[in-house]
């Protein structure tokens, strides 16, 4: 009887050891699974965080780019407004030149046109007030232009045109012309004027 009990005790002891081993292995496996799950969760969290940071940086850069674009747009609008104001003031200044200064300007513009056309006889056209000034001083006008050119030229006053000032000079038959009205001169020089005005105003 005592031998049977010993056998039963041994069996129970071995069973208990197996149970403890199984439980221990199960615990280890559970910890391993938990650790792997934690690591995956952590990796996932890090990935989400990196993605969020990347998206946030992209949004930040987009916002900065948009703000810079808006600032540039506003700056260009202000620049354009100021350039237009300067050009408008220039037109007004040219349209209100004192008579003597304006007369000399007309002589210069006519001389330049005749040089470009390479003709000795021309028709000069402008607004009514300008033509009236030229007619009043026609002998002096012809003499001044001739002296600048270094040769005698024949100048005829033509029909009035719509302009704030300056002259349109054309050949007697109207086949060739040079538009030296103030509007045309400003238009031809506008790109250069804009660059100079922008540099003066904005550096």
UniProtKB/Swiss-Prot annotation:
Question: Sorted alphabetically, which NCBIfam families does this protein's record hold?
Answer: PRK03963.1
Q: Which residues form the signal peptide?
A: none
Protein localization: Cell membrane
Keyword Transmembrane helix among UniProt keywords:
no
Hey, which family's this protein in?
A: Belongs to the V-ATPase E subunit family.
Q: Which biological processes are named by the entry's GO terms? A: proton motive force-driven plasma membrane ATP synthesis
GO CC, any one term: plasma membrane
Q: Which PANTHER family match?
A: ATPASE H+-TRANSPORTING V1 SUBUNIT E1A-RELATED
The molecule here is called: A-type ATP synthase subunit E
Q: Which CDD domains match?
A: ATP-synt_Fo_b
Purpose of the protein = Component of the A-type ATP synthase that produces ATP from ADP in the presence of a proton gradient across the membrane.
Q: Please give the Pfam families that the UniProt record associates with this protein.
A: vATP-synt_E (PF01991)
Note the topology in the membrane.
Peripheral membrane protein
Keyword set includes Membrane = yes
Query: Any idea which UniProt keywords this protein has?
Result: ATP synthesis, Cell membrane, Hydrogen ion transport, Ion transport, Membrane, Transport
Subunit architecture: Has multiple subunits with at least A(3), B(3), C, D, E, F, H, I and proteolipid K(x).
**InterPro entries documented for this protein:** ATP_synth_B-like_membr_sf (IPR028987), ATPase_E_C (IPR038495), ATPase_V1_Esu (IPR002842)
Which GO-annotated molecular functions does the record name? Answer: ATP binding; proton-transporting ATP synthase activity, rotational mechanism; proton-transporting ATPase activity, rotational mechanism
